[in-house]
Amino acid sequence: MKQQAGIGILLALTTAICWGALPIAMKQVLEVMEPPTIVFYRFLMASIGLGAILAVKKRLPPLRVFRKPRWLILLAVATAGLFGNFILFSSSLQYLSPTASQVIGQLSPVGMMVASVFILKEKMRSTQVVGALMLLSGLVMFFNTSLVEIFTKLTDYTWGVIFGVGAATVWVSYGVAQKVLLRRLASPQILFLLYTLCTIALFPLAKPGVIAQLSHWQLACLIFCGLNTLVGYGALAEAMARWQAAQVSAIITLTPLFTLFFSDLLSLAWPDFFARPMLNLLGYLGAFVVVAGAMYSAIGHRIWGGLRKHTTVVSQPRAGE
């Protein structure tokens, strides 16, 4: 069990690192390529890669599962959610820094929590509410220098925030639908179907020929984005299979900090290619509060449960005392 937990930690960290680096690479490609085209290539590469892996393992999804309309509807909802999330997230990167986009993305777990209560009839814990409030407070701190602009003017920066919030919101529909689909299919099978369907849906919107205009560096970044999608989500699925979902979710919340770390590091090494995040001390602190809130929402109940259990064990009198 310890070995499985160790592997689960490494896989979850792999996902957080992949997702942390992703928007930095995408920002380079967005200088030439529009969001729908980038997302098209990401889904195409991920679909081919995951399809090949499942074919070798003889684990391609059985289509007989979708003979019932209910499962087809759920698949359509999940596809629309992932489609919208990828497009809106890429669009937000046109106006925001990679770190800002990832910090806003932490709203997704809060939305998933609310949706799980109303749609899946799950119980909301007090630690989840506290974590959500911490996260929202962290967002205010992170955007402290831009709050007036965001709420009073419809600037490019405001559009970036709107797209980012939209991406986090539509992701919830994907998350809820996938949670139900997992009763019939394994996570890699669901992802393969979603990648394939999203690739087909994006083809009319994409401009595949633009790839010829990319520099060697930008082409490398685009390939990295495609592989990142395959590895990031694949590692997440394997982590969930080997470790408890709450702990995996807690590690995934570190994603914005990896983005912040990579952005600072790359801007120092190659300032001509990578812009340094324009954050004051309160902004940096806000990023940490956002992550802490998301993490507390994911595992806060386990922390308090462990403390109560420890207190109970310690307070029990022994025989003869």
From Swiss-Prot:
Q: According to the UniProt topology, which residue ranges lie Periplasmic?
A: 27-35, 92-99, 152-156, 212-216, 271-278
Give compartment(s).
Cell inner membrane
Summarize what gene deletion causes: No visible effect on bacterial persistence.
Domain of life from the UniProt record? Bacteria
Q: Which residues lie on this side of the membrane: Cytoplasmic?
A: 1-5, 57-70, 121-130, 178-190, 238-249, 300-321
Membrane topology summary:
Multi-pass membrane protein
Q: What is its main location?
A: membrane
Keyword check for Metal-binding: no
Annotated TM spans: 6-26, 36-56, 71-91, 100-120, 131-151, 157-177, 191-211, 217-237, 250-270, 279-299
What the entry lists under Pfam families is as follows: EamA
Under InterPro entries, the record lists:
EamA_dom
Report keywords, A-Z: Cell inner membrane, Cell membrane, Membrane, Repeat, Transmembrane, Transmembrane helix, Transport
Keyword check for Transmembrane: yes
Task: Provide the family line.
Answer: Belongs to the EamA transporter family.
Q: What is this protein called?
A: Uncharacterized inner membrane transporter YhbE
Species of provenance: Escherichia coli (strain K12)
Gene symbol? yhbE
